């Protein structure tokens, strides 16, 4: 339905129900350049995530949207036992390549990487007694569209993700500030909190409404690619990514419902405690849920 109204970059499907917007490989390649490696992660993000996991005694971590593996690599390097999954094989190949290149390091030899589908995650990933922490960051969950129009697939995916968390464990999941995007038509001001890319030249935001309801947000990226132009000069690559616009209040209900209400839930705005009506407009909302039952 979405594609008949508005053309996205969903050129293939890596796992049933989840469109792979990186299926042609080109977007995955440019995205890898765009986000960089672990050195491109902001110091604030790294300190926050590592501090949160260590504060709660987490060791066994499931990254359910690992992409090229940049966060998983950081966690492996920091001594965590990591299982990494993604629906896009084009993205996973970068993580698999890194594991192969560093296979002589015991931590990387033990790093588990699998292709998996959020809609069948409980069958795709053996959770055992559950993971100490499950992370789904970088606006990843918003890649899952609402193809049926009732958010039933969102509910199923979140229920499966929550089932991976052991009692007392954490789910850390985020989304962009779509409340601001839908009210203004553009992304919030401020730099990306996750990575410090110097290759971005432009990001154009578009909102698609269906029956007066926001159905999809698209971000059109123009990225400078070193050596892609004539005579080795920088060139430019454009690609589009499409997202479901999760607003804060409705997503809060969804994630709490995924735990059957048995959770402690806090919301951060760009790594800081968020208060509705505050002056600072965050780029991302981060939900931290501790499973209590």
Curated annotation (Swiss-Prot):
GO CC: one term?
A: methyltransferase complex
Residues binding S-adenosyl-L-methionine are 22, 31, 34, 41, 65, 86-88, 117-118, 137-140, 176, 221
Keywords of the record, alphabetical order, are: Acetylation, Cytoplasm, Folate-binding, Methyltransferase, Phosphoprotein, S-adenosyl-L-methionine, Transferase
Q: Name one GO biological process term.
A: sarcosine metabolic process
List the transmembrane segments. Answer: none
Tissue specificity remark = Abundant in liver.
What broad class of enzyme is this?
Answer: transferase
User: What positions does the entry give for (6S)-5-methyl-5,6,7,8-tetrahydrofolate 2 binding?
Assistant: 6, 215, 240
Please name the Gene3D superfamilies in this protein's record: Glycine N-methyltransferase, chain A, domain 1, Vaccinia Virus protein VP39
Catalytic reaction annotation: glycine + S-adenosyl-L-methionine = sarcosine + S-adenosyl-L-homocysteine + H(+)
Q: Where does (6S)-5-methyl-5,6,7,8-tetrahydrofolate 1 bind?
A: 4, 6, 240
What is the recorded function of this protein according to its Swiss-Prot or TrEMBL entry? Catalyzes the methylation of glycine by using S-adenosylmethionine (AdoMet) to form N-methylglycine (sarcosine) with the concomitant production of S-adenosylhomocysteine (AdoHcy), a reaction regulated by the binding of 5-methyltetrahydrofolate. Possible crucial role in the regulation of tissue concentration of AdoMet and of metabolism of methionine.
The protein's name in its UniProt record: Glycine N-methyltransferase
* Species this protein is from: Rattus norvegicus (Rat)
